[in-house]
Amino acid sequence: MRNSLPSRPALSASRTKEYQRCPLQFRLHVVDRVKEPPTQATLLGTTVHATLENLYALPREERNETLALELLRTEWEKTLAADPSVMNLFTDHADFERWHERMNSMIKNYFAIEDPQALEPLSTEALVEATTSQGINLLGYIDRIDQAPNGALRVIDYKTGKAPSPRFQEEALFQMRFYALLLSLTKRLPKRTQLVYLASQKVLTFDPDSADISRFSEELSRTWESMRRDALQGYFAPRRSPLCNWCGVRTMCPLFDGTTPEIPTSGLERLLAMGPQRSDQ
């Protein structure tokens, strides 16, 4: 379940990739714990993911499109009752209706991609925690793990955003390699990992092997060493990219005339606790 709490400070796939793109953005989210306001995109993603999790909690024969749309409506009503202010994300009723229709279409599209009545997942929204041989703590909330009769594992991650072009597919697979490493440390290397893009009905498949995941583990170690150096010197550099246009903490970035807050010592200590402890910390 997504509401399961990690047992210790650890790196996630999204935050690790975030550091590689922009150390300052990573710092503000992980060290300072700056919370960004919800957006239409994050609201849609959260609601759709919860719906698919609830779908697989049903008996196999009940997992049909009609009932899935009812689950979606229930999940949305629960979200709205808990926080009516989410309606402020929409400019008017027409804007909300367009958003709501996109959400419905993603659930319908899911049934064109997979038959949930033919599947019996090993887990949904599972919190997986592990420590690498280098002593780096990792975690991931994995949308779905399937297990074949022969024991082979398949990792599924639902995506409500746009499918990447071939040029950017390797970056999208960072998360799948991260999850493959997690499972290799806790269960066994998955036979297959898939990113399921609900809007376009595209599926990006990656079949990991031990050599690839070993190289990825080494990449994580190098990234961790860079994080650690930044933490010890108390400086995480901003890095300009086209993604700056969508950055939720840009007002705190010096590249955009923002003021970066003083770095909290407690946050640095929490970050350093994600890796092996050394005498120079």
Predicted regions and their residues:
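C-terminal, charged and often intrinsically disordered regions of DNA end-processing helicases
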Residues: 1-42, 272-281
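Short, compositionally biased low-complexity segments
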Residues: 18-26, 47, 65-87, 189-198
